[in-house]
Design a protein with these regions (language model features):
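Short acidic low-complexity segments
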Residues: 39-40, 69-81
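Predominantly a Rossmann-like dinucleotide-binding segment in NAD(P)-dependent oxidoreductases
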Residues: 142-240, 373
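Beta-strand-loop-alpha-helix segment that lines the small-molecule cofactor/substrate pocket
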Residues: 84-85, 91-92, 96-143, 158
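Glycine-rich phosphate/pyrophosphate-binding beta-alpha loops
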Residues: 203, 262-269, 327
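C-terminal capping/lid region of NAD(P)-dependent oxidoreductase domains
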Residues: 3, 161-165, 368-381
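Hydrophobic residues in well-ordered beta-strands that form the structural core
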Residues: 111, 136-138, 167, 260, ...
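N-terminal Rossmann-like dinucleotide-binding module
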Residues: 1-65
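C-terminal glycine/acidic-rich active-site capping loop/insertion
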Residues: 7, 231-239, 247, 251-252, ...
Length: 381
């Protein structure tokens, strides 16, 4: 490995997200293009070390993708100065221990979300990283989706006027695992293993809200475990102890009201698996993973309520599709490149451990709201 090469420890490369989005779509793609381009125009190459518990699995994965370095010994990898960055894609329960070790070893740290199971631990990680002087970042992948980037442009252009409300629909039907294999791992449905849709999705909604609309000031949430029994990877039935749906109302800074339904027990009747409708005084938009359509004020139809006559107007035809006039790369890869440049030349990357901790805090507040039946205020952290 060259002295100028950035060494990255990847812990959790055999998992669903760690493998597909981070290892294959991001890091191997960055390595294949020769690294990242710095502001002076030079390329900084990366080298990858994958870590896991099963050496045979790691060996097979390394051979498949031409990765030279792999190990089951995290401590030894962290002690090696060739590896400057530690990335964590483990299950949430195992995350804090590894990150603390990496910080203590002086490594820069990038991690999947949520950063911890509790906001106390999440803010502790932020404090430890700051005290150690290491760069730190948390995956904020939804911000890099083509649809949300188009939405950001609309907001920055003033298209909406005053933004009034945000409505979000996320989810799809995850099969129960009996007659059809589930698309998500069984631990997602066990609270004792760190599962639940609130702890998974509310951190996402937090960074979407605070980066596009304004920070979350309060939340009212209702959760449900609609399907109480599922079938695991071993073919055995198990009790689902975690929420599989969450219905949230969020008060955002500036008086914006947001409402998001998150569910793994909903059948999709929309163009994409997530859609947000943003309504403002001067116009509205509906955006998804890729698509975005708008309806300006001066092209808004004037409906009238008449239950005696069948509706003949096609309201979906009143929207104008935003053209895709640039190539959007994989969002995980784009953020990886930003974090690497943050490490190499202190380029901006605001999505740090403190931002990640605010997401954990919102998830906790959502669970507290569900338990108490109250709206929960959030501190400005």
């Amino acid at each position: 490995m060259s002295e100028s090469t950035i060494g990255i420890i990847v812990n959790g490369a055999t998992g669903r997200m760690g493998y597909r989005q981070h290892l294959v779509r991001s890091l191997l793609a960055i390595h294949g293009q020769g690294g990242v381009v710095t502001k002076d125009g030079t390329r900084q190459q990366i080298e990858i070390m994958i870590i896991g518990r099963n050496e045979a699995t790691l060996k097979e994965l390394a051979a498949k993708h031409g990765i030279e370095h792999y190990t089951t010994d995290l401590d030894a990898a962290l002690a090696d100065p060739r590896w400057q960055i530690y990335f964590d894609a483990l299950v949430t329960q195992a995350r804090v221990k590894g990150i603390k070790k990496a910080i203590a070893a002086g490594k820069h740290v990038y991690t999947e979300k949520p950063t911890a199971e509790s906001s106390e631990e999440a803010f502790e990680l932020a404090r430890l990283a700051k005290e150690a002087g290491v760069k730190n970042g948390v995956v904020h992948d939804k911000l890099y989706l083509p649809g949300l980037q188009k939405l950001k442009r609309l907001i920055d252009s003033g298209f909406f006027g005053q933004i009034l409300s945000v409505r979000g629909e996320f989810g799809y039907w995850v099969f129960e695992g009996d007659w059809q294999q589930a698309q998500r791992p069984s631990w997602n449905y066990r609270s004792e293993d760190g599962g639940g849709i609130i702890v998974d999705m509310f951190p996402h909604w937090n960074y979407v809200f605070e980066n596009l609309f304004g920070r979350v000031e309060s939340v009212y949430a209702r959760t449900a475990t609609h399907i109480p029994t599922r079938v695991g990877e071993d073919g055995e039935a198990y009790t689902a102890t975690a929420d599989d749906a969450a219905y949230g109302v969020f008060d955002l800074a500036g008086g914006i009201v947001a409402q998001v339904n998150s569910s793994w027990v909903v059948r999709v009747d929309r163009k994409e698996l997530v859609e947000f409708q943003v309504d403002g005084t001067l116009g509205s938009a509906v955006v998804g993973l890729f698509g975005a359509k708008i309806q300006p004020r001066n092209a808004t139809p004037r409906p009238t309520w008449n239950p005696d006559l069948a509706e003949t107007h096609d309201y979906t035809a009143d929207w104008l599709e935003i053209p895709t006039n640039e190539v959007f790369e994989n969002g995980f890869k784009t953020q990886w490149e930003q974090f690497l440049l943050h490490v190499i030349e202190d380029a901006p990357h605001p999505y740090d451990f403190t931002a990640g901790a605010r997401g954990v805090l919102l998830a906790e507040a959502g669970l507290e709201s569900n338990a108490t039946g109250r709206r929960i205020d959030l501190p400005n952290t």
